[in-house]
Each structure stands twice: as structure tokens, then as C-alpha cells.
């Protein structure tokens, strides 16, 4: 899953807190271009730095992030603990595997990743 701590999260100094949970922005959000909030979203995302990363884990990343609307997020999730507004929910996570691949390709080059195969994974997951 592609992860980006949004400008409000960076400005609030929450990069470290989020880490404890172990191409241009217009192109990134191109699938939302027909939505009424698109221009405002692009302006907001360009208003400051973002901290981009890639997380991997079966069924855990979305649970750690919480729901898009912080009001629907459980305590113990990033959005449940640090957010109150859907428009400023501090973190982005890809909604599908296909979008994750596209978003990761916008932000990173393939050679920036290290292949890592955890041997115990076969014992934990079928």
C-alpha cells in the first residue's frame, strides 16, 4: 500500500507518531478530477511537504490507518487517534492493489526497493 502523511500531519509533527505504527499530486489524484473537491484537494496537497512510504502487510495496513472518515475510525488507529475531520485526515492509503501499484510507480523507482522474503510468512499465512 502506498502511504503519504499529508501536510497537516507533517505540520503537526506526527510523522514519528505514524511511524510507530510501523509524480505530481494532480496526477496522483487524477481519478478524482471530476469531483467538486478536486481543485481544493490538489491545492491542499501542494501546500507543504508530504512524507511518502510503502507499507506491506496482509489485512493490517487499512486497520492501522483507520477509515477515511476519522469519525468512523476505531481508537488505536492513526485516524482514530489523531484526526477529527475527513478533509484533514493526515494520511493517505491506497484503496486497491491496482491503485497502490500506480501510486507507488508515481512516487518511487523500482530500484529504490529491496526484495525481502520473510521465511516465517509461510508458517503464519496460508
UniProtKB/Swiss-Prot annotation:
It catalyses: a 2'-deoxyribonucleoside 5'-diphosphate + ATP = a 2'-deoxyribonucleoside 5'-triphosphate + ADP; a ribonucleoside 5'-diphosphate + ATP = a ribonucleoside 5'-triphosphate + ADP. ATP binds at residues 6, 37, 68, 79, 89. Keywords: ATP-binding, Cell cycle, Cell projection, Cytoplasm, Kinase, Magnesium, Metal-binding, Nucleotide metabolism, Nucleotide-binding, Nucleus, Phosphoprotein, Transferase. GO terms for biological process: CTP biosynthetic process; GTP biosynthetic process; UTP biosynthetic process. Pfam families: NDK (PF00334). GO terms for cellular component: cytoplasm; lamellipodium; nucleus; ruffle. One of its GO terms (molecular function) is nucleoside diphosphate kinase activity. PROSITE patterns: NDPK_LIKE. PANTHER family: NUCLEOSIDE DIPHOSPHATE KINASE. Major role in the synthesis of nucleoside triphosphates other than ATP. This is Nucleoside diphosphate kinase B. It comes from Macruronus novaezelandiae. The lineage of its organism: Eukaryota, Metazoa, Chordata, Craniata, Vertebrata.
Amino acid at each position: 500500500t502506498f502511504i503519504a502523511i499529508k501536510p497537516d500531519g507533517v505540520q503537526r509533527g506526527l510523522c514519528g507518531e505514524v511511524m510507530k505504527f510501523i509524480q505530481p499530486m494532480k496526477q496522483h489524484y487524477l481519478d478524482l478530477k471530476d469531483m467538486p473537491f478536486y481543485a481544493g484537494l490538489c491545492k491542499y496537497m501542494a501546500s507543504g511537504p508530504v512524507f511518502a512510504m510503502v507499507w506491506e502487510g496482509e489485512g493490517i495496513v487499512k486497520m492501522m490507518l483507520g477509515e477515511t472518515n476519522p469519525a468512523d475510525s476505531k481508537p488505536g488507529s492513526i485516524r482514530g487517534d489523531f484526526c477529527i475531520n475527513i478533509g484533514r485526515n493526515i494520511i493517505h492509503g491506497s484503496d486497491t492493489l491496482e491503485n497502490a501499484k500506480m501510486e507507488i510507480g508515481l512516487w518511487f523507482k523500482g530500484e529504490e526497493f529491496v526484495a525481502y522474503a520473510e521465511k516465517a510468512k509461510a508458517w503464519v499465512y496460508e
